[in-house]
Amino acid sequence: MISATNWVPRGFSSEFPEKYVLDDEEVERINQLAQLNLDDAKATLEEAEGESGVEDDAATGSSNKLKDQLDIDDDLKEYNLEEYDDEEIADNEGGKDVSMFPGLSNDSDVKFHEGEKGEDPYISLPNQEDSQEEKQELQVYPSDNLVLAARTEDDVSYLDIYVYDDGAGFHSSDIPVEEGDEADPDVARGLVRDPALYVHHDLMLPAFPLCVEWLDYKVGSNSEEAANYAAIGTFDPQIEIWNLDCVDKAFPDMILGEPLDNSMVSLKSKKKKKKSKTGHITTHHTDAVLSMAHNKYFRSVLASTSADHTVKLWDLNSGNAARSLASIHSNKNVSSSEWHMLNGSILLTGGYDSRVALTDVRISDESQMSKYWSAMAGEEIETVTFASENIILCGTDSGNVYSFDIRNNENRKPVWTLKAHDAGISTLCSNKFIPGMMSTGAMGEKTVKLWKFPLDDATNTKGPSMVLSRDFDVGNVLTSSFAPDIEVAGTMVIGGVNKVLKLWDVFTNRSVRKSFKSELENVQARAKEEAQKIGKSSRIARKYTSNDNPDTVITIDDQGEDEEEREGGDEHDDMA
């Protein structure tokens, strides 16, 4: 199951990601995190004993067994050290695989040798040639995008980090040679490379992931230097932040949400928590994290929304909640959030109170800081986004999409309303490079729909027209997102209840090119101009020049290899 996706723009990833190093400082940090988890487990055990009673022999025996297990460090238990001497591990190329050390466990070239004839045991490391080959395999080029996909399989969750290479050159000799081609290294060498999508590395997550947000800020640094991190929100109330430029990392770089205060040690039991009704907790979330939004203007600020009905603004330097807002959505779940594209003080949120809120976080009085626009009474807002600096889009649990103009007074009727799906909206995306392009998906349906909607005239109430509807064989659709760079302006990823991730270039479809002809031409002209400024040639500027382009979808199969699906004739059965 792919439950959330996001993109990393070109140029932010380290070209050669570093390998995880288990030094003394890292060991101390891990020990602190492990102790918190152990305290959590002990508190859970005490709670279970208190509820079950000591008179139940079966429950007592089970509790004693659990207590004995707690004496074994969780990090060591997976290695089965108690039965280590009883196991026979096959000798592989003169040594055994190293599994004791997180920084070495995933390296098949690192071997442990017992030693012969009284010699001391030792570890053999890869030679310089092997290291260079591995370094090249991990290389991320400046022209590559990363795709972040939150995946759950067999009750275990991961964040998969994909590399998307849009390719180079053109197979067709009809594509004209243009000024600036000689300055592009790939084109100058005559290199022709097809698009490719593959898994670079992955991270194991503590709970089912609900959202993922890319950060260009180095957490805990107080630095303006660009970085490459990901924040993951799950059914747990904490937010984990990981460095995407580090491979084989065992623990996150930062956890937002006061893990100690938010652990079972301090929140003894759910019953006591409900009875006490402590009110607004300002330091951390107490329920699932439903959405996050990184502020591109104030880069040390991350907003999060939760099923605990609050919106929190996090300081990424200290890891603390700088502000907590509890009354924006009338004590209802806050499901979605996004910062304004031009104003870093304005936060857009949607909630289960049927309202969209536009909040100025600089205002201290919560009763005066938000303006509201409402969907139909009883509908729950599932997702919100800016289509432009003045137009808001929101999707609801009944399958409706609403458009509001923030220049109108609050509580005004929507500019238009669209019955997009018969089930609740799970994903709603607006393409920031192609004005008026919108994609939708529903958690109870298997199709992704592409729409064209009026954007330049706020008085146009005609509403969107569907360009196409397509089943990508991902099961019920849970997530989709458009690429963040102009060179891949028409590319989107799609995920659903099936574990495969699909990548689709929408402009390889003839109907899409026809519907957005002028918008595509404008993007191509702009991309060409931007490429020439940096001495390169634009690939998108010369794409889609003929009408016989195959409709292309890239699929990642079970082995993590990409397969390219091509629909002949540039048509598709599900076309509108």
From Swiss-Prot:
Keyword Repeat among UniProt keywords: yes
GO cellular component, one term: cytoplasm
Region (Disordered): 41-134, 530-576
Biased composition (Acidic residues): 46-58, 71-91, 558-576
Matches recorded under SUPFAM superfamilies: WD40 repeat-like
GO term, biological process aspect, one: rRNA processing
Keywords from the named record: Phosphoprotein, Repeat, WD repeat
Modified residues (Phosphoserine): 52, 131
Signal peptide span: none
Pfam families: WD40
Composition bias type Basic and acidic residues, residue spans: 108-120
WD repeat ranges, renumbered to this chain: 207-252, 284-324, 329-369, 376-414, 420-461, 472-514
Keyword hit for Repeat: yes
Miscellaneous comment text of the record: Present with 43800 molecules/cell in log phase SD medium.
Record family assignment: Belongs to the WD repeat PWP1 family.
Record protein name field: Periodic tryptophan protein 1
Organism: Saccharomyces cerevisiae (strain ATCC 204508 / S288c)
High-level lineage: Eukaryota, Fungi, Dikarya, Ascomycota, Saccharomycotina
Name of the gene: PWP1
